[in-house]
Swiss-Prot record:
Protein family (similarity comment): Belongs to the DRC6 family.
Keyword Cytoplasm: yes
GO cellular component, one term: motile cilium
Description of how the protein assembles with itself and partners: Component of the nexin-dynein regulatory complex (N-DRC).
Source species: Chlamydomonas reinhardtii (Chlamydomonas smithii)
Gene: DRC6
Biological role stated in the UniProt entry: Component of the nexin-dynein regulatory complex (N-DRC), a key regulator of ciliary/flagellar motility which maintains the alignment and integrity of the distal axoneme and regulates microtubule sliding in motile axonemes.
Compositional bias ranges of the Basic and acidic residues kind: 14-30
Region described as Disordered: 1-43
Protein name as annotated: Dynein regulatory complex subunit 6
Keywords attached to this entry: Cell projection, Cilium, Cytoplasm, Cytoskeleton, Flagellum
Domain of life assignment: Eukaryota
Length: 260
């Protein structure tokens, strides 16, 4: 009988180059059409090369994206989402995303089925540009840092934009909005509305931009120019006067050698 090999045979080495296991929520999101977990739980191409395509598959399959009260969501994700333009997406809810600073939904054909957008309570949100043929409801309430909102959504019929104390500029184009409440937006200086069906509006008094007052004294440049002109005229006059002076002396000693 042959002796047994010591060690029970060779153990297989662990393959360090194997793809990490997939999160079960990825496939569930594809099947349900809803993503509700943080951005950091999505597949990431930096973790595994093929996960970039997997990430795109998850996002483009979504009908609803709800990522609330997180600091991990930044402008890069918002731009990625708009660029992918998921064909069945109807709801984007990014409420409470404290590190979201700019949101640009453009051009008009982006996210062709999107109807609802919630960007409320985003502490760092500063600028919003929305262009959409399909969006009907937008929530921008309680954004303390937002300064400018440009909204061109012909079918918009609900806009919540109260309690935005830093908002300076609002430009709004919509055919269906009937009510507009800007209570708590007390820093407004520019409000341009193209809303033919607007019936009721609450708009605080606009702040008048400071006008530049012309100084009562002449500008320094004009004074310098005037001084230079006067000096030039004086120099020319002196030159003419010197040229007109004639030496009337009868001395035969040349003028240059005359003693002082």
């Amino acid at each position: 009988m042959a002796p047994k090999k010591k060690g029970g045979g060779k153990k297989k080495k662990k393959d360090d180059g194997a793809e990490p296991p997939h999160d079960g929520s990825w496939e569930r999101a594809v099947e349900s059409g809803t993503w509700e977990k943080p951005v950091t739980d999505l597949p990431d191409a930096n973790t595994w090369p093929t996960w970039g395509a997997l990430r795109e598959r998850v996002l483009t399959a979504c009908r609803e994206i709800k990522i609330n009260n997180t600091a991990s969501l930044r402008d890069a994700f918002a731009n990625e989402l708009v660029k992918l333009s998921p064909p069945e997406l109807t709801l984007i809810d990014l409420r409470g995303s404290s590190n979201l600073h700019n949101f640009n939904l453009s051009p008009m054909t982006t996210c062709p089925k999107l109807t609802d957008l919630d960007l409320s309570e985003c502490a760092g949100l500063d600028y919003v540009l929305l262009q959409s043929q399909t969006v009907r409801s937008v929530n921008l309430r309680k954004n303390p840092a937002i300064t400018k909102a440009l909204i061109h959504c012909p079918r918009l019929n609900k806009l919540s934009i109260t309690d935005c104390p830093a908002l300076e500029t609002l430009m709004l184009w919509t055919d269906e909005l009937t009510e507009l409440d800007l209570t708590g937006c007390n820093n407004l200086s520019v409000v341009k509305l193209q809303c033919p069906n607007l019936l009721d509006s609450k708009i605080p008094p606009l702040k008048v931009a400071p006008q530049h007052v012309k100084p009562s004294h002449p500008p320094i440049a004009s004074l310098l120019k005037e001084n230079l002109t006067t000096a030039a005229h004086k120099a020319a006059a002196d030159k003419e006067a010197l040229a007109g002076v004639k030496d009337t002396s009868d001395s035969i000693i040349p003028h240059v050698f005359r003693p002082f």
